[in-house]
């Protein structure tokens, strides 16, 4: 084969590999964002119920604990989802 088709095939293979890596990173980050939104919704619902009833909902706390979230200071300005 001549050098031009070989270079073209190699460049195409490299481009495909780069695209797979980039989209894999995008999917991983998207899942992190979705998980964080779910956690934020649970915390907001927990706070709302605590304000309404005066005590916290054990079911939602256990759901947060299963996800590995510690309860404590909920600071909206401490968002690290970039």
UniProtKB/Swiss-Prot annotation:
Entry keyword Transport: yes
Main location: host cell
Disulfide bonds: none
Keyword set, alphabetical order: AIDS, Apoptosis, Host membrane, Host-virus interaction, Inhibition of host innate immune response by virus, Inhibition of host tetherin by virus, Ion channel, Ion transport, Membrane, Phosphoprotein, Transmembrane, Transmembrane helix, Transport, Viral immunoevasion
In-chain residues carrying the UniProt-annotated modification Phosphoserine: 53, 57
Record-linked Pfam families: Vpu
Transmembrane regions: 8-28
Keyword field contains Metal-binding: no
Cytoplasmic compartment residues: 29-82
Processing and modification events after translation: Phosphorylated by host CK2. This phosphorylation is necessary for interaction with human BTRC and degradation of CD4.
Function recorded in the entry: Enhances virion budding by targeting host CD4 and Tetherin/BST2 to proteasome degradation. Degradation of CD4 prevents any unwanted premature interactions between viral Env and its host receptor CD4 in the endoplasmic reticulum. Degradation of antiretroviral protein Tetherin/BST2 is important for virion budding, as BST2 tethers new viral particles to the host cell membrane. Mechanistically, Vpu bridges either CD4 or BST2 to BTRC, a substrate recognition subunit of the Skp1/Cullin/F-box protein E3 ubiquitin ligase, induces their ubiquitination and subsequent proteasomal degradation.
Comment field (misc): HIV-1 lineages are divided in three main groups, M (for Major), O (for Outlier), and N (for New, or Non-M, Non-O). The vast majority of strains found worldwide belong to the group M. Group O seems to be endemic to and largely confined to Cameroon and neighboring countries in West Central Africa, where these viruses represent a small minority of HIV-1 strains. The group N is represented by a limited number of isolates from Cameroonian persons. The group M is further subdivided in 9 clades or subtypes (A to D, F to H, J and K).
Family: Belongs to the HIV-1 VPU protein family.
Domain comment (free text): The N-terminus and transmembrane domains are required for self-oligomerization and proper virion budding, whereas the cytoplasmic domain is required for CD4 degradation. The cytoplasmic domain is composed of 2 amphipathic alpha helix that form a U-shape.
Subunit structure: Homopentamer. Interacts with host CD4 and BRTC; these interactions induce proteasomal degradation of CD4. Interacts with host BST2; this interaction leads to the degradation of host BST2. Interacts with host FBXW11. Interacts with host AP1M1; this interaction plays a role in the mistrafficking and subsequent degradation of host BST2. Interacts with host RANBP2; this interaction allows Vpu to down-regulate host BLM sumoylation.
Protein name as annotated: Protein Vpu
Species, as recorded: Human immunodeficiency virus type 1 group M subtype B (isolate BH8) (HIV-1)
Lineage, broadest ranks: Viruses, Riboviria, Pararnavirae, Artverviricota, Revtraviricetes
Gene: vpu
């Amino acid at each position: 084969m001549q050098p031009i088709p070989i270079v073209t095939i190699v460049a195409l293979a490299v481009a495909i590999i780069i695209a797979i890596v980039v989209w894999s990173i995008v999917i991983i980050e998207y899942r992190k964002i979705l998980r964080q939104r779910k956690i934020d919704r649970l915390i907001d619902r927990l706070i709302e119920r605590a304000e309404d009833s005066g005590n916290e909902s054990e079911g939602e706390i256990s759901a947060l604990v299963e996800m590995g979230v510690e309860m404590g200071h909920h600071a909206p300005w401490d968002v690290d989802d970039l």
